[in-house]
Regions:
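Conserved catalytic cores of phosphodiester-cleaving nucleases, focusing on short active-site segments
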Residues: 346, 366-385, 404
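Short glycine-rich substrate-engagement loop in P-loop NTPases that contacts/grips substrate
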Residues: 53-84
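Interdomain motor-coupling "hinge/lid" segment immediately C-terminal to the ATP-binding subdomain
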Residues: 128-247
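Conserved lysine of the Walker
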Residues: 31
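Hydrophobic positions on the alpha1 helix immediately C-terminal to the Walker A/P-loop
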Residues: 34, 38
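N-terminal pre-Walker A segment at the start of P-loop NTPase domains
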Residues: 1-14
């Protein structure tokens, strides 16, 4: 299975300023596989330590963090010398041993020749709870579920993925039905690696759904196991409200849908916990535009998306036939799935900040506004071929962006002020 993150890891390996690397991401997005596969491809030796199941290694890091001593202990454990140039040290579930996390500082300062990558299912929570390691001593990489392009490659459509990157939209349009069919499959399967692997091997949508149910059950178990007891009920209510939040025409998160009379302050900790786990994407509102967009963020108004479009469909109880064959009653939630899909793809683009826009009167709403660092791009999302873009026109007249994007099932078309970008090509948004 190809992951774009492998290329990022290769750049990390070759960097003269390389630091120990922490890979962040939700449970089961493929962090362990990625680290092992990177070691297999790029090193002659991989030293893999899982701190959740290895008490001996926990004891090694319990005393002083002298790097020579730690390397000696690791060598004794694996039974051979560790070559700084050819060995990859993999610390998995590193949040289980905070001292191992703290040791990264000393590896960076005293033994930078060693190549170290770390990950953990709930590492984001550990970092925000004050687990000790100095800022500036580590590199970070965020891992998400497979993007649509990675899904194409995983399902044997490597040439179609490469064609998207070529931006030969005349050729792309000739094969649009292939892309549309694959996109429908992606809406159902999503990008969780186990679900994608099952789909590529068996093409069994029922089996995919069972895998997604198991993943969601594991997330719920994490709530009980790792979250503070006092917020667990609120976590569950907030998490389970997301499909109904996104089913609304106005997808702004409303606490009253979580529980009648609910207030923001009652759920702030639960929301932060879900965000730190990587289970949700919080997309905040802006009501004006400038670089950086973050300076205009309205923290009180936001949309909440889940980590994966396939999991959202599973949470909502969508059936295979409804999604793949179409149903008039499904049209409203199809908009929710499409916005979820677009948000998910935008999040996989490095250094892209994602917001949404409404004016103060609420008469103009743009589904997403992205900050590339060089320009602000408004994105209006249409689930079908609908080419109306009233809000986008209003936004364009007010802010005169360099480019405005309508993402829909229609073919690529560049007009005077507007680009219609097919949904299956949304990852090309920075280059157009």
């Amino acid at each position: 299975m190809y992951r774009v993150a492998i290329e990022k890891l290769l750049k990390w390996k070759q960097s003269k300023r390389r630091k120990p690397l922490i890979i962040e991401g939700a449970r089961q997005v493929g962090k362990t596989w990625l680290m092992k596969e990177f070691g297999r491809q790029s090193y002659t030796d991989t030293v893999y330590i899982n701190f959740d199941s290895n008490s001996r290694m926990a004891e090694l890091f319990a005393s002083d963090l002298d790097t020579d001593r730690l390397i000696m202990g690791l060598e004794l454990y694996v039974g051979h010398k560790i070559d700084p140039n050819n060995s990859l040290l993999v610390f998995d579930e590193v949040q289980e041993v905070p001292r191992a996390l703290a040791s990264l500082k000393y590896f960076y300062e005293n033994a930078p020749q060693y190549h170290i990558v770390c990950a953990g299912s709930l590492l984001g929570i550990a970092l925000h709870q004050g687990t000790s390691f100095p800022v500036g001593k580590v590199d970070f990489l965020k891992l998400y579920p497979l993007s649509f392009k990675e899904f194409l490659m995983a399902t044997g459509k490597e040439q179609f993925a490469a064609l998207l990157d070529s931006q030969d939209f005349q050729m792309i349009t000739s094969f649009k039905q292939t892309y549309i069919d694959a996109l429908k499959h992606y809406y159902f399967v999503g990008g969780m690696p186990e679900a994608v692997q099952s789909f590529t091997e068996n093409k069994d949508f029922n089996e995919v759904r069972e895998i997604q149910k198991r993943i969601l059950a594991a997330y719920e178990q994490d709530f009980s196991k790792h979250a503070p007891n006092e917020i667990v009920p609120r976590l569950r209510m907030l998490w389970n409200s997301i499909p109904s939040q996104l089913a609304k025409e106005n997808k702004k998160f409303i606490y009253g849908l979580v529980r009648e009379g609910a207030r923001a302050k009652d759920y702030e900790t639960a929301l932060l916990w879900l965000s730190d786990c990587g289970l949700v994407h919080k997309v905040s509102r802006v009501n004006t535009v400038g670089i950086p967009l973050r300076a205009y963020e309205d923290l009180k108004a936001f949309k909440l998306f889940v980590v994966d479009v396939g999991l959202l469909g599973c949470m909502a109880g969508l059936r295979q036939r409804t999604l793949l064959d179409g149903n008039d009653l499904f049209l409203e939630f199809k908009g929710a799935l499409t916005e979820q899909y677009v948000c998910q793809q935008l999040k996989t683009i490095e250094d892209l900040d994602v917001y949404y826009y409404t004016n103060d009167r609420g008469s103009c709403e743009i589904d997403f506004v992205v900050d590339t660092g060089e320009r602000i791009v408004p994105v209006e999302v249409k689930a079908e071929v609908n080419l109306r873009a009233k809000s986008l026109k209003t936004y364009h007249e007010k802010f005169a962006p360099e480019v405005s994007v309508r993402a829909s099932m229609a073919d690529y078309k560049k007009e005077e002020w507007l680009v219609n970008l097919p949904l299956y090509a949304i990852d090309q948004i920075v280059q157009i």
